[in-house]
Curated annotation (Swiss-Prot):
Subcellular location: Cell inner membrane
Pathway as given in its UniProt record: Cell wall biogenesis; peptidoglycan biosynthesis
Catalytic activity of the protein: [GlcNAc-(1->4)-Mur2Ac(oyl-L-Ala-gamma-D-Glu-L-Lys-D-Ala-D-Ala)](n)-di-trans,octa-cis-undecaprenyl diphosphate + beta-D-GlcNAc-(1->4)-Mur2Ac(oyl-L-Ala-gamma-D-Glu-L-Lys-D-Ala-D-Ala)-di-trans,octa-cis-undecaprenyl diphosphate = [GlcNAc-(1->4)-Mur2Ac(oyl-L-Ala-gamma-D-Glu-L-Lys-D-Ala-D-Ala)](n+1)-di-trans,octa-cis-undecaprenyl diphosphate + di-trans,octa-cis-undecaprenyl diphosphate + H(+)
Physiological role: Peptidoglycan polymerase that catalyzes glycan chain elongation from lipid-linked precursors.
The name this protein goes by in its record: Biosynthetic peptidoglycan transglycosylase
Bilayer-spanning residue ranges: 28-48
Protein keywords: Cell inner membrane, Cell membrane, Cell shape, Cell wall biogenesis/degradation, Glycosyltransferase, Membrane, Peptidoglycan synthesis, Transferase, Transmembrane, Transmembrane helix
Main location, first listed in the record: membrane
EC assignment: 2.4.99.28
GO terms of molecular function: pentosyltransferase activity; peptidoglycan glycosyltransferase activity
GO terms for biological process, alphabetical: cell wall organization; peptidoglycan biosynthetic process; regulation of cell shape
Amino acid sequence: MSKLKKTKHPFPCFSIWQQFKRKLYRTFALFLVLFLSSVVLFRFVPVPFSAYMLQQKIGYLFEGNLSSTIHYQWVPLEQISQSMQLAVIASEDQRFATHYGFDWDAIQSALQHNQRGKRIRGGSTISQQTAKNLYLWHGQSWLRKAIEMPTTLVLETLWSKKRILEVYLNIAEFGPNIFGVEAASQHYFRKPAKQLSNAEAALLAAVLPNPIIFKVNKPSAYVKKRQQHIQRQMGLLGKQHLSQLD
């Protein structure tokens, strides 16, 4: 009895497309598993580096700048002064304790502010900034924003507010190659982050929107004005505000 010969697919292009889709689904599933696994892992262990740190390092390598060093030192939230914790909430996200990752009022306010042609202001929450810094790339992109939203929701679901704040403070950029509040505190003030005063914490928080242009060691009039505003907001919130974080 003769063996049956395999017949070729009548539509080879369709067959290639099906194979491509299967590979695409598998790749997506692999990335999803790796992402969720890392979120669960980083709920308990210090973050060794962020996607933005990696992006910066790769950029330096492409430029041929092999001597550039990323300054980064992880510290638990208990070793970061309450002044610093309150400063970033007062500066970046005053509804952090109560929202679920997104502050729609702040987003709408930022859009209206930017449409008036004033200094560009963002509406991203601390949760969104943590998602972006930890897993995504910087720059204006609708694709990044589209990925940022579900990433933020996953962090809000699997992490506590305290953990989100802890990771944010440890991976935020405070100057060229200076990541995390401990590295920033040691670099600018020669002291650990747990000893930061209200004024020092407010100054660090003041440069967060653009730490490459805004300088901690040479604050412009605008940065000083932001620092004073943040200190006033810290006084209005009060350190008891931190007790609202779960």
